[in-house]
């Protein structure tokens, strides 16, 4: 497996371009299955999960053309196979997203239960109950979800008992072609959900209320072609801002959406960063200062994203003072703590709370990535450590960060990838 070798102690300085958001790209690629005409999607990040979903579409007989700039044209009318097989689905939980659009457009779907991250339980029950409420017959046998409907799905009022991003997206896609109106209550409000709604509306859908906790979908008989650019990745943006902050540096992130990062920027200002924003850029300057410890609690958007928790923990490792981090979204999401402590961190975990006491200096060590955001946090910690850190199992990083070592090198980091 590839490794990253990082020599810490360099102050980051420079400008980088932010990639398209993986968490918007995946549902949008799934939603191409709803259209009766070819659709084009641009600004896709060049990531393993995106490639896997494109491969899944191709395996099902969907006509996919991709250029060297990651613009994809998809024509779902050529679909031959309504099954998403285990060997592709096992690596990525987002593959469950093809269930809603397939049953809505083609009347049936068979999707293997997904794999992906190792963090906690992510039940798909909400997706299945919602589809049943819209008239689908659902059977789970031998690890596959088999869904079918006679005619069209029917609009329904669906109250989700917990806020779920993929659940909201799956049901929103299914409802786009249903007969009648669907109301999704307790819906996820994430910008990626809004981007998916914008994409469906560009194809002729009638979705309103995306970005609030009640989404209204008036079903239409067919969806047509369109061109759509995926929104910028707010988590990638936040990760690079923290990487600059931990080194006392300066960074300008370009082609991003500052309005999607209010909770993150507020905490960075608390840590002592000077933040300036424009329409599509954010500049952070630590002016060589050591960060101050911050306390935070993860919660659904627009609050602090769980996907930024590990990165803020890394910042706290070398900060002045003590910060407390409470994880409310996923269980078992402190797997990076053990690895950070190998670098000389002082972290104590009590249930879903981590208490981080800042130390003067971290020391480079061999560490192992356990999930996507944990691996990014280990890279951030390594940038501030003295000596050399080796981060193993970085296939986790490659699932969510496009060219991470190249972007960090352009900011002055000493980092290289060593192939297995």
Swiss-Prot record:
Subcellular location: Cytoplasm
UniProt keyword annotation of ATP-binding present: no
GO MF terms held by the record: UDP-N-acetylglucosamine 1-carboxyvinyltransferase activity
Residues engaged in binding phosphoenolpyruvate: 22-23
Residues at the active site: 117 (proton donor)
Disulfide pairings: none
Name this polypeptide is given: UDP-N-acetylglucosamine 1-carboxyvinyltransferase
GO cellular component labels: cytoplasm
Major site of localization recorded for this protein: cytoplasm
InterPro entries registered for this protein in UniProt: Enolpyruvate_Tfrase_dom (IPR001986), Enolpyruvate_Tfrase_sf (IPR036968), MurA_subfamily (IPR050068), RNA3'P_cycl/enolpyr_Trfase_a/b (IPR013792), UDP_GlcNAc_COvinyl_MurA (IPR005750)
EC annotation from Swiss-Prot or TrEMBL: 2.5.1.7
Gene3D superfamilies for this protein: Enolpyruvate transferase domain
Originating species: Alcanivorax borkumensis (strain ATCC 700651 / DSM 11573 / NCIMB 13689 / SK2)
Top-level EC class: transferase
GO BP term, example: cell wall organization
Flavoprotein keyword on record: no
Residues noted as binding UDP-N-acetyl-alpha-D-glucosamine in the record, renumbered to the chain: 93, 307, 329
Superkingdom of origin organism: Bacteria
Catalytic activity, reaction form: phosphoenolpyruvate + UDP-N-acetyl-alpha-D-glucosamine = UDP-N-acetyl-3-O-(1-carboxyvinyl)-alpha-D-glucosamine + phosphate
Role according to the record: Cell wall formation. Adds enolpyruvyl to UDP-N-acetylglucosamine.
Modified residues (2-(S-cysteinyl)pyruvic acid O-phosphothioketal): 117
Pathway(s) per entry: Cell wall biogenesis; peptidoglycan biosynthesis
Record family assignment: Belongs to the EPSP synthase family. MurA subfamily.
The encoding gene: murA
Any Pfam family hit: EPSP_synthase
Keyword annotations from UniProtKB, A to Z: Cell cycle, Cell division, Cell shape, Cell wall biogenesis/degradation, Cytoplasm, Peptidoglycan synthesis, Pyruvate, Transferase
């Amino acid at each position: 497996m590839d490794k990253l070798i990082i020599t810490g102690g360099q102050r980051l300085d420079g400008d980088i371009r932010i990639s398209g958001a993986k968490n918007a790209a995946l549902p949008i690629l799934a939603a191409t299955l709803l259209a009766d005409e070819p659709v084009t999607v641009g600004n896709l990040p060049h990531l393993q999960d995106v490639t896997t979903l494109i491969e899944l579409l191709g395996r099902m007989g969907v006509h996919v053309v991709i250029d060297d700039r990651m613009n994809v044209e998809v024509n779902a009318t050529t679909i031959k196979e309504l099954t998403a097989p285990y060997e592709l689905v096992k690596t990525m939980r987002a593959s469950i997203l093809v269930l809603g659009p397939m049953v809505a457009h083609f009347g049936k779907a068979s999707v293997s239960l997904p794999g992906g991250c190792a963090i906690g339980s992510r039940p798909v029950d909400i997706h299945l109950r919602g589809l049943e409420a819209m008239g689908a017959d659902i059977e789970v046998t031998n690890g596959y979800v088999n869904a079918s409907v006679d005619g069209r799905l029917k609009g329904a009022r669906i109250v989700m008992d917990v806020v779920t991003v993929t659940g909201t997206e799956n049901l929103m896609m299914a409802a786009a072609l249903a007969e009648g109106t669907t109301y999704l209550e307790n819906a996820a409000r994430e910008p990626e959900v809004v981007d998916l709604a914008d994409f469906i509306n560009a194809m002729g859908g009638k979705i309103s209320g995306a970005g609030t906790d009640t989404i209204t979908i008036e079903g239409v008989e067919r969806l047509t072609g369109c061109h759509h650019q995926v929104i910028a990745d707010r988590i990638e943006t936040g990760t690079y801002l923290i990487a600059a902050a931990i080194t006392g540096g300066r960074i300008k992130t370009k082609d991003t959406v500052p309005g999607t990062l209010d909770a993150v920027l507020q905490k960075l200002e608390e840590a002592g960063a000077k933040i300036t924003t424009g329409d599509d850029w954010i500049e952070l300057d630590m002016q060589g200062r050591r960060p101050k410890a911050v306390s935070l609690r993860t919660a659904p958007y627009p609050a602090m994203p769980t996907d930024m928790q590990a990165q803020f923990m890394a910042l706290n490792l070398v900060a002045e003072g003590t910060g407390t981090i409470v994880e409310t979204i996923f269980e078992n999401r402190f797997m990076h703590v053990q690895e950070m402590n190998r670098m000389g961190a002082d972290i104590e975990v009590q249930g879903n709370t981590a208490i981080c006491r800042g130390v003067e200096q971290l020391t480079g060590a061999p560490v192992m990535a356990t999930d996507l955001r944990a691996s990014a946090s280990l890279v951030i910690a390594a940038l501030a450590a003295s000596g050399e850190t080796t981060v193993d199992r970085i296939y986790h990083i490659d699932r969510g960060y496009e060219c991470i070592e190249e972007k960090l090198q352009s900011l002055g980091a000493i980092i290289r990838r060593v192939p297995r």
